[in-house]
Structure formats: C-alpha cells, structure tokens
Amino acid sequence: MQERHTEQDYRALLIADTPIIDVRAPIEFEQGAMPAAINLPLMDNDERASVGTCYKQQGSDAALALGHKLVAGEIRQQRMYAWRAACLQNPQGILCCARGGQRSHIVQRWLHEAGIDYPLVEGGYKALRQTAIQATIELAQKPIVLIGGCTGSGKTLLVQQQPNGVDLEGLARHRGSAFGRTLQPQLSQASFENLLAAEMLKTDARQDLRLWVLEDESRMIGSNHLPECLRERMTQAAIAVVEDPFEIRLERLNEEYFLRMHHDFTHAYGDEQGWQEYCEYLHHGLSAIKRRLGLQRYNELAAQLDTALTTQLTTGSTDGHLAWLVPLLKEYYDPMYRYQLEKKAEKVVFRGEWAEVAVWVKAQ
C-alpha cells in the first residue's frame, strides 16, 4: 500500500479489518483505537511522558535523542522482537502512530533494517479516526427502521438476523439495561465509535444497502453513548414493535440472564468464583434500580433473588427467579417502556409477534 492515502484508502482499511500495529503508548491506545489494532508501543507511558516534557523544555532534537536513549539496548531488542513477530503474523498489516509522524517512521525504519518492509498509515490514527467519524455521519443519513418491544422480546436477535442490521448492543458490549453488562469490558467512547463506523462501512459494502435495521435504543448503552448524528436520525425513524406473549419473553430472559450468564461466569472464572460473580452480577443489576423501585420493594425483590439463587445452587433450577423477575417486569420495565413508546407513538408503523415483525422487516 502506498504511504499517501486517500479517503478511500482509509475506508478500505476499516472495511477489510486490516491488522494495524499501533505503536502509540498504551494510554493513547486505551483512549481510542481502531477495531483491528494491536498495541505494540514504541514507548511506554512513562517514556512518552518523559519525551513529551523534554520536547516542551528543550525542543524536538533533544526529545528525539532522549527517545532513542530510552528505547535502546535490551528494551529495543524486546520491542523489535514483538514487532517482527506481529509483521510475520500479519503480512497484510500496517503500522500506525498518532499522526503518521516520527514514531511509526522510526519503527518502519528499524524493521527495514531488519529485513522487513512494512507500510504505515500516513496521517496515523488521527486520519483513521476522522474517517470513522465522517463515515458514520454519511451512513447515518440512510433510512432507519427501529425494532422496539418490551424487555425479552428478542429485539437483538431479530436485528442480528438482518443483512442490513447493526447490533448496537453487541458493539457496545452491553445490553442496555441495569442487568446489561457482559463479561467483556466496554470500550472507550472513541473505540466504540470506531467499531461502529467500521461495522456500518462493512455492512454497507456487502450490499446495495437501502436502510438500516437497528434496535430502539436510548442515547446511552451502558457507559457508551451513540454518536449524535446517528441518535438524531434514530429519533426520526419508523418503529416496528415486537409484541410477544409474556411467557415467551420470560423464556428468553431465563435463557439470556440466568442460564447463559451463569454458564459464562463459570466458564471464565471456574465453578466457585464464577458462581460468586454471577450472584454479584444479579444483585448489582437489582441494586442499580433500587431508588426507582423504592426501598421496601427493593428489599422484597432482593430477598426473593437470594432465595432463587439458593434454589439454583442446590437444584440447578432457575424457576425460582420468576418470583422476582415477573414483578420486576410488570411493575418496572414494562410500564417504563410503554411510557417511552407512547411518546413516539406516531413513529410506530408495525406491530406483531417476533416472526411477523421479522417478515415485515425483510419486506422493507
């Protein structure tokens, strides 16, 4: 790849999930990175801070000299080993630093001296980030159909099954409710936006996309918020509402929040610690809405949750959770969603059970 990139080149990198060897410091990477990037820094956080201070006090030549002094000898050898291995594992990859400046050029030169020619992103992460932002703004202008419905309606699955669907909750690593956390930590806001842009670009590139199918989300999904350009378009979008029987919703919630989460926690942490993490996850979710439930109702539901967990631990049955889940849905989640839906009733264009909504969406 040439080192003078056009806008199309940057978009192509995101669409192809091109491996990116990001040589920025870890603190920069954590604040925002591209989806296919791995962080193999030229300088660690402390080294970067020292060079930055030197640059401000003594200028660029002194800072460059300090950088070479800090990244020398065994440290340089260790980092070269990691870069070489990454290049060999990702022959179609590309180097990236903050702005396509000295850091990526230095690593590129060192690799060349070691017999590896590897391209870099001219303009660096900043250019890719601006491309992601602009792509989201442009792609959000296409028509949108939102999938709505009460908790447990299978909205996310319906979106996932559409070729023009984008699973916002999956990208955010959060299901959007008090019980919405997953075992994967949420990304930084910038990384979430970059991932969303890449997913929209890939989805758009696979087909002659006429409209987006998205879940009816609020502005916040856990700690991530939707880009304003997309959120604004979603407030104007048509809504198809899934209205499944209450019992079907309970089955889905039992599978998703009790059976699957228990499995995921024990798979990640082992039986004993996994069980403790699972119990803490459910209690934390209930505690998050304590103020809205009121102390008395919260205490009642928390006691029922404890009883259900004891039953699940001793018998393996999750049926006991219905004692607190049913009133939580009927007294809190369902009224809250219906109230929110009433405020945008004029946007609702279709209602039906899950299969009916799926057929309707595919016909659009």
UniProtKB/Swiss-Prot annotation:
PROSITE patterns from the UniProt entry? RHODANESE_3
GO molecular function (one): transferase activity, transferring alkyl or aryl (other than methyl) groups
Catalytic residues as annotated in Swiss-Prot or TrEMBL: C97
What EC numbers are recorded for this enzyme? Answer: 2.9.1.3
Which Cys pairs are S-S linked?
A: none
Listed under catalytic activity are: 5-methylaminomethyl-2-thiouridine(34) in tRNA + selenophosphate + (2E)-geranyl diphosphate + H2O + H(+) = 5-methylaminomethyl-2-selenouridine(34) in tRNA + (2E)-thiogeraniol + phosphate + diphosphate; 5-methylaminomethyl-2-thiouridine(34) in tRNA + (2E)-geranyl diphosphate = 5-methylaminomethyl-S-(2E)-geranyl-thiouridine(34) in tRNA + diphosphate; 5-methylaminomethyl-S-(2E)-geranyl-thiouridine(34) in tRNA + selenophosphate + H(+) = 5-methylaminomethyl-2-(Se-phospho)selenouridine(34) in tRNA + (2E)-thiogeraniol; 5-methylaminomethyl-2-(Se-phospho)selenouridine(34) in tRNA + H2O = 5-methylaminomethyl-2-selenouridine(34) in tRNA + phosphate
Q: Which superkingdom does the taxonomy of this entry point to?
A: Bacteria
According to its UniProt entry, the function of this protein is described as: Involved in the post-transcriptional modification of the uridine at the wobble position (U34) of tRNA(Lys), tRNA(Glu) and tRNA(Gln). Catalyzes the conversion of 2-thiouridine (S2U-RNA) to 2-selenouridine (Se2U-RNA). Acts in a two-step process involving geranylation of 2-thiouridine (S2U) to S-geranyl-2-thiouridine (geS2U) and subsequent selenation of the latter derivative to 2-selenouridine (Se2U) in the tRNA chain.
Q: Assembly and interactions?
A: Monomer.
- According to UniProt, the name of this protein is tRNA 2-selenouridine synthase
Protein's organism: Shigella flexneri
Its taxonomic path starts at:
Bacteria, Pseudomonadati, Pseudomonadota, Gammaproteobacteria, Enterobacterales
